[in-house]
Amino acid sequence: MQTAVVNRASPASLNRTGLEQAVNVSVSPLPENGSTVQAVIAGMLVMLAGTIPRNILFAANLRYVPSLPWAVPIVAVYLWIFWRYLSGDGPPPETRAWRRSSLRANPLSARAWTLALLAGGLGIVALVLGLWLANRMVVLPAQDASELAGIPPLTVWSLLLVAAPIAGIIEEAAFRGYMQRPIERRHGPAIAILITGTMFAVAHLDFTPILWPYYVAVAAVYGMVSFLTDSIWPAIVLHTAGNLYSNTDLLLHGKAEWQASAGPSELVWSTGVDHAFAMTLAAFLVVSAGAWLAYRGLAATATTPATPPSGQI
């Protein structure tokens, strides 16, 4: 699988481009097993350096010449440069090995790819079913596409669909790479996933405390795949697929996926356990069991990946 290789800009190059200061802080050399605080700071700075420019460009696109998605190619170029920098390219040479190791973009065998995507895919399906159940048990925050009204469809679809892989790449690099890897080496995957899941939740603008378990569950799906394969590539694919589903569902139905179940919208405490709730619960249990078995299979066959060729997996 060919990957977009990204040159890492060093403090000197970043200062010239206006990106350097943010990234330079996030990629200062850290020990391979640096402290939890260092890992959290590094991951959050990577996330901010990757998402803030995208958000600014997308907002500008919606305000200036909104009839054309002109921000898409600019963001794509920025992402390419940013990825290369995170993966070890560019100065300073003293941080190249640390950046490459922290990114965790290691190659995988075909078998590891298959099992990782199977386990993570079942995990995502279980998450969606779990959200449908949660929406019948508690009041989840509403999410709709009303703020996109009046924007040309070409621009809306282009920005939201392109946002899916961008978020997948940047957030996995930040949370499952730079942040999770050093924490799991010091404290194990459970604590690492709990911490990264919490920070993953805080990083989302729509976060409310009631959604914290959901974000930790998302971190568990992606984090365990990354831990068992020692690579963020499957998580990037899964994250992108999940975002594509969510964004497409939002545009087609005008509301979030957890509000789109076919059953009654009333809380189960008022309606009782109806047929829709029972069927969703049964599906959730079956899919969750399948995901658990798939993760066990992935754990049984996990191997240490070979050193990746430059820019490839």
List the predicted regions and their residue ranges.
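Alpha-helical transmembrane segments in multi-pass membrane proteins
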Residues: 37-95, 112-116, 278-280
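Active-site His/Glu-centered metal-binding helix of metallohydrolases
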Residues: 169-174, 178-179, 183, 202, ...
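Small-polar-interrupted transmembrane alpha-helices in polytopic inner-membrane proteins
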Residues: 189-204, 216-219
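Short, Lys/Arg-rich, polar N-terminal cytosolic tail immediately upstream
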Residues: 2-33
